Amino acid sequence: MNILMALSQLEVTGAEVYGVTLSNELIKRGNNVTIVSDTLTKKFDGEYIKIEFNKRGLFQRINQVISLLKIIKEKDIQVVHAHSRASSWSCEIACKIAKIPLITTTHGRQPVHLSRKIFKAFGRETITVCENIKKHLINELGVDKNKIKVLRNPIDTSYYPFVYSDLKKDNKIVSIIGRLSGPKGEVAYKVLETLENVSNISIQVIGGKEIPEKFNKFLNKSNIKFLGYVNDIPEKIKNSDLVIGAGRVGVEAILSGKPLIAIGEAQYIGLVSPDNLIPAL
């Protein structure tokens, strides 16, 4: 099958990791996969074509649709799979013109406004990564529940062997993993404010293409390091005593045997235990 994956991130996100992981597995199984996106950082085994979906002016949207139709025709694309609001808008129109199916994956909560309810752009079928997002789409955006399936983040578990943490050592390494923009950035900022003066904790902040100005107050703290984007997330999780994050990062931490404080954009779970594992997922 010839598949087109559409992303729109400006920095590495869970959606990119999801999309690339899925695409590489589809290629291994004999499919042809092309990715279109504003940027692409993770290693991808197929062809990447740049389309700047975050440029949302009318003429830019028209150019995006034209580019998509050209790719669909040249590569004989049979299905498009979009992973973001920005990309799904243009893909919805292109797929209707080309008369091919659009599948979408919703990785997080969506803005609720009238235009989103009128022009949903969720495709023929939509996938959500958890039950809470499914409920959100049904109750707040009016998406047909029969067109939604829950499929959790695809993770190669061979990268995340279970290793017990040594909680008796004096200095603990706390890893905050996620981008520093948007709601996740607000969460990271509040966590750093809370922990910055705790003497026996070393904090590593992983993720974020650039450090927002408001985080500058933490740059001179000897116990806080901003590592930016790193390729060896499994190794960083392995060397952590506590992970703070959400989404696929949370699942990766649990698989690795690391204590996890789950803080998402819309919900605070806290320290994940057997008692709250199901709602955390």
Predicted regions and their residues:
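Nucleotide-sugar donor-binding and catalytic loop/hinge architecture
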Residues: 1, 161-173
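N-terminal strand-loop element at the rim of the active site
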Residues: 5-60, 208-215
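Acidic donor-binding loop of glycosyltransferase active sites
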Residues: 77-79, 235-251, 257-261
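Short His-centered aromatic/hydrophobic patch
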Residues: 82-88, 106
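Carbohydrate-associated surface elements
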Residues: 132, 154
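Conserved catalytic-core segment of nucleotide-activated headgroup transferases in glycan assembly
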Residues: 170-211
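Nucleotide-activated donor-binding/catalytic signature segment of Leloir-type glycosyltransferases, i.e.
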Residues: 207, 212-230
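Catalytic binding pocket for nucleotide-activated donors in carbohydrate/polymer assembly enzymes
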Residues: 251-281
